[in-house]
Swiss-Prot record:
Name of this chain's protein: Egalitarian protein homolog
Main location: nucleus
Organism: Caenorhabditis elegans
Changes seen on gene knockout: RNAi-mediated knockdown results in animals that are viable. However, animals display a small, but significant, defect in nuclear migrations in hyp7 hypodermal precursor cells where an average of 3%, and up to 21% in a single animal, of nuclei fail to migrate.
UniProt GO BP: nuclear migration along microtubule; piRNA processing
InterPro entries with a match to the protein in the record: 3'-5'_exonuclease_dom, piRNA_biogenesis_EXD1, RNaseH-like_sf, RNaseH_sf, WH_Egal-1
Amino acid sequence: MEEAKNMALLFFMDHLMQKNGRRTIHDLSCQFGARGFSEEMRNAVGTTQEGLTEFLQGHPSLFTVEGDQVILNGHNDLNAKNNPLLQSGIRSRNYEKEAVDFFVTKLTKFGPELQIKSLLGHRSQAAPEVRLVSGRHLKEFCEFLQSQVDYFVVEGDRVRLKNMPEPDENAIEMDDEGRPLAGVKAKQAAVEYLKSVLEQNEDQPIPLDQFYQNFCQRFSHTIRQDVATNPKELLQFLKLNRGLFFIRSNKVSLVKNRLNEDGSENGSDEGEETNNNGMFPLDQSALTRIHFVKALKPAQDLISRLWQDINNMEKKVVGLDLKTVTVGVDGEIFLSLGVIATTSQIGIFDLASSDVIILESGFKGILESEKVVKVIHDARRVASLLAHKYAVHMRNVFDTQVAHSLLQHEKFNKSLNEMRPISFINLQRVYYPQSIMLSDVTPRKMSMCPNWGVRPITEEFQLTIVEEAHCLLSALYQSLSNLIPVHLRGVFEDKCIEVNHPEVLLASPNRPPPQPFISSPYRASTRRDVRNGGSIMQSFSPAPYAAAPRPQMSDACTQTFSTGDIEVLNVFYE
């Protein structure tokens, strides 16, 4: 009976902590039928509201009963250290050890490395005392994991087992040149090993969990971080190589290659095109081709070099990406970074450091050039921003978001308005998964949403910044361009024009007039137009739009339909 009382106390404390420390007696009594509230616990506290009230009043150090309200004392700072129920002198069970064992079991099953918030999601399956000692919220849960240094290792937003599976003596640690495996070479080595495992068991598919254990026995944790740190990530990695691996019912086997008429083998019919435009791979060696500028003069020089590359192209195409940040309570969007990629170099422009870079460096000229194709993903998100804050109107745009929607429309015969937008990482997985394999940027990092307002920008972060523009130019442009049917090319061009001309969308009484140019929230621009003596903001304010007239006062008796002072907005009929 004493054990049941303690369990009931823990249950109500946990419920009150989840509900901000205050609930009614009626609400607590409704928990009698909740999952985890046993019949012994109900008998211990009384099966009625009156019995529950007496039970709670019998523990004044924990609860305060005011009328029909129950308040948990000190719920803001309640934890395992100052909770009298969890002191070692009172309890007979080590709840902290039970919590550790619970999360070790979950990491062993789903890990051995997971995002902390993913591991926290399993907390709802634990007993009330385990939920109590491990913390109520993400911050407290992180502190609990960090305190258990003998069991867990916390790195950023991820946690892994300290005693995780380690490779055997046949572990692969070095490449052919004797250097540690990393990046693209680590992914290639993983593919070759996993392929060899399946070739040895060709007759029978291997369960994914067992397949991951084989992977852990051959590669150390450092290398696994570039490929997959848990079975779920390994599944995503295998899908990037769907020309080799076939997955069904969480079992993995090799793709059965078919012989074509010419005798060549064909395994997968989509996403198998190669990088045929001669563009450099995106790895550590590519850093010499990536140029980061944050001042006007270096930006002008970089634009000149980019124009030289463009003019030497037979078909003038660049990859374009504009990174934005959201600032303030109202969520106002500003440009933070601009990326332009050619086949030989990539330029990163820090648009947050200086407002005039986009206007005076020549960046605007590339965006508005009719002779240069700009390949961008989801241009609608930045077209309105460019037009109404900078008076920049992009022309000759190839929007991969529009291309994907048209292809889905053709395949499934759905209306374009019903098509959901696709993220860039999923666009890569569908049309060119090799771009992830050929990049040093891990799929884990690519699936996250970085903060593009972070400064300073490291070399590793530069690879993340240019990934989208590089992939758009090196692979997705040619792939999607070839997939668009001839009869849809006219529609595609019209849709690209539509998303890049937000003034058409603004012709609605429900939308506000366009805003004048606004300086960056990071650093106010002090550059002036010396020739005219005016501000650069005045020089580039959007002239085509007239300012809204100021409201005027009128005598009520003179306001009529004929004078135009009264307008009919909607007419309703019964």
